[in-house]
């Protein structure tokens, strides 16, 4: 069987109506999966099956999983993609804003994962849960401290769930760097080329491809891992740049 053929598989993508989430949903759909996406507002374009859900509410997270099982008969893959945060200076941001950021980016994925595990652990073949993190959780994140802390916590959550829920359920993280067109930030192409070794941001489809890999039999022994999709990271500004002309790195 083709390892990236998801025909007959049931997949849920939270925050799957735009940006990276929409690309992930489209990739699984193209691979033959039946896909259910959720968001707090309806999508503006045609997408796979959609249900409105605010996954910060554990009851709505459970209802999302139940809706998937009702449609597909089983649930094979959950991609916890919903998240994000506005720019906020840590010294002056309100406690309420910080709490909401952590709730959306850390607590909500736990709600969805708990509901998914209840189903996956009881079905033949188990299942896969993928957390969409961020490089903001791996290095200082000025202007988004609470977001970076939540994403760091999300990776730790994934490793803990991977240990607790093995062998039936595999849990991994995807850790994107700058992504073009995801709507979360405005990228300066020159700054990205100067900072990222590969010389450009990722495309949403490139993040989606890694999700396909982690959900497939090709990653059957991979759990508790964090796969960086960041083009080589970020060249430290205080080190001499040894990489050659910028133009050579963006091709």
At which residue positions do the language-model features occur?
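Substrate-binding pocket helix/loop in short-chain dehydrogenase/reductase
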Residues: 89-102, 192
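Alpha-helical segment proximal to the catalytic Tyr-Lys
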Residues: 118, 162-167, 220
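Active-site helix of classical SDR
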Residues: 113, 150, 158
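Short C-terminal tail/terminal secondary-structure segment
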Residues: 1-2, 139, 223-251
């Amino acid at each position: 069987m083709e390892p990236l053929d998801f025909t007959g598989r049931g997949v849920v993508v939270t925050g799957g109506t735009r940006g990276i989430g929409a690309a992930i949903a489209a990739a699984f759909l193209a691979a033959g999966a039946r896909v259910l996406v959720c968001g707090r507002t309806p999508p503006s374009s045609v997408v796979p099956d959609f249900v409105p859900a605010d996954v910060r509410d554990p009851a709505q997270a459970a209802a999302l999983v139940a809706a998937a099982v009702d449609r597909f008969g089983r649930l094979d893959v959950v991609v916890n993609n919903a998240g994000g945060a506005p720019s906020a200076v840590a010294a002056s941001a309100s406690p309420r804003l910080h709490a909401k950021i952590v709730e959306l980016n850390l607590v909500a994925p736990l709600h969805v994962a708990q509901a998914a595990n209840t189903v996956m652990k009881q079905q033949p073949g188990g299942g896969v849960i993928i957390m969409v993190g961020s490089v903001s959780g791996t290095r200082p994140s000025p202007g988004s401290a609470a977001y970076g802390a939540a994403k760091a916590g999300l990776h730790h959550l994934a490793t803990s769930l991977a240990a607790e829920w093995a062998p039936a359920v595999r849990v991994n993280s995807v850790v994107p760097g700058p992504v073009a067109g995801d709507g979360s930030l405005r990228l300066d192409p020159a700054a990205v080329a100067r900072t990222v070794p590969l010389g450009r941001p990722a495309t949403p489809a490139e993040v989606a491809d890694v999700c396909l890999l982690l959900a497939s039999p090709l990653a059957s022994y991979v759990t508790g891992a964090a796969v960086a999709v960041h083009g080589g990271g970020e060249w430290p500004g205080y080190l001499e740049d040894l990489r050659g002309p910028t133009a050579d790195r963006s091709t």
